[in-house]
Amino acid sequence: MFRGATNINLDSKGRLAVPIRYRDLLIEEAQGHMVCTIDLHHPCLLLYPLSQWEVIEQKLSRLSSMNPAERRVQRLLLGHASECQMDGAGRLLITATLRQHAGLHKQVMLVGQFNKFELWDEETWYQQVREDIEAEQSATEIPSERLQDLSL
């Protein structure tokens, strides 16, 4: 399980050093093989261990290519998916196309989200956090039953 937000610098080649606390788990779970793709709703990337991505691919393969909405999701997620292998120094190369899509510059945030990571431009991440907090503070809708059962 991946949790927490970590500031990371991309090097000049677009590589990020995976935090040490995740490296052993990623090697154990997927031999350091990862898949990076776009997020459909936010200006960030999604980074999955290969074993977790294969579950997503199975679900995507069951969607109908004849349904326009389902085909769009397949096209966007699979069409942008890029395999990346953690090197001996624990770094992952994020392709230029994906970096450009998410507006990634030197400072990025690696955000654990259970079975995957989100990869954000640092400034964009902090802006999103502010917006999310403001939305929660001003929310007028009744929380879903699942949120009502969540006790923090």
Swiss-Prot record:
Q: Which UniProt keywords apply?
A: Cytoplasm, DNA-binding, Repeat, Repressor, Transcription, Transcription regulation
Keyword NADP belongs to the record:
no
Which InterPro entries does the entry link to? MraZ, MraZ_C, MraZ_dom, MraZ_N, MraZ_sf, SpoVT-AbrB_dom, SpoVT-AbrB_sf
Q: What is its main location?
A: cytoplasm
One matching Pfam family is: MraZ
Q: Please report the stretch or stretches of sequence annotated as the SpoVT-AbrB domain.
A: 5-52, 81-124
Question: Which biological processes are named by the entry's GO terms?
Answer: negative regulation of DNA-templated transcription initiation
Give the matching CDD domains: MraZ_C, MraZ_N
Briefly state the protein's biological role: Negatively regulates its own expression and that of the subsequent genes in the proximal part of the division and cell wall (dcw) gene cluster. Acts by binding directly to DNA. May also regulate the expression of genes outside the dcw cluster.
HAMAP family xrefs: MraZ
**Subunit structure of this chain's protein:** Forms oligomers.
Q: Which family does it belong to?
A: Belongs to the MraZ family.
Record's protein name:
Transcriptional regulator MraZ
Name the gene: mraZ
